[in-house]
Amino acid sequence: YPAADSPIVPEENIIIGNTVLYGAISGETYFRGIAGERFAVRNSGAATVVEGVGDHGCEYMTGGCVVVIGSTGRNFAAGMSGGVAYVLDEVGDFEKRCNLAQVELEPVQAEDVSDVALKRDDLSEVMSDMLRGDARRVRVMIERHALYTGSTRARLILENWVKYLPRFIKIMPVDYRRAVREMEATAEEPQPLAVAGE
C-alpha cells in the first residue's frame, strides 16, 4: 500500500504492475490500490484482495480466491478452470467484461456474519468449502484487507455491508463446481468394510 504521506488515492491508482501473483501456489496478499493487467494469472492457491484490476484478471486461474473491491478490465476469468473470484459490481456491467466461456456468475447470498471472528493467522475456516459460505468468506477477507492495509475502501464496504453485499458477484468455473460436488458426493457414500480372508 502507498506510504501514509503519499498524495495518491490508492483505490484510484495502479499501484502494482502486470502479472502480479503469476502462478502463486499459496499465501495471502492484500493490495491497497489497483493492479495492472493479468492479475492473478495462473493463480493456483493464493488468497488475495485488490481494489481493482486491469484486463485479463484471473486468466487461467486454477485455484485460490480473489476478491476485487473495485472495477475490472475486460476478459476477466478467461480460461479460468479452478478457484473462486468475487467482484464488487457497483455499476452492474461486470458481465460484459467477463469471459463466460468456462465460468458462471452468481450473486453472493446474504448470510449471518455477526459471529465472524477475525483470525489474523488462519483463513482455513472460510476457505474449506468453496460452494458455500460466500458472504462469510468475502467479509473475512475484506476485514483482513482493512486490517493489514488501512484501506478506506474496505472500511466503507464493511461499514455499509448490507448495501454492498448484493453487489458482489461470485465467479466460479463450471467444471470446478462439478468436480467439487462429485468429490462431496463420493465422500458421503458409505465405504464397504473389508472382511479378513476375502
What are these regions (language model features)?
Residues Y1-E198:
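Long, distal/terminal scaffolding or interaction modules
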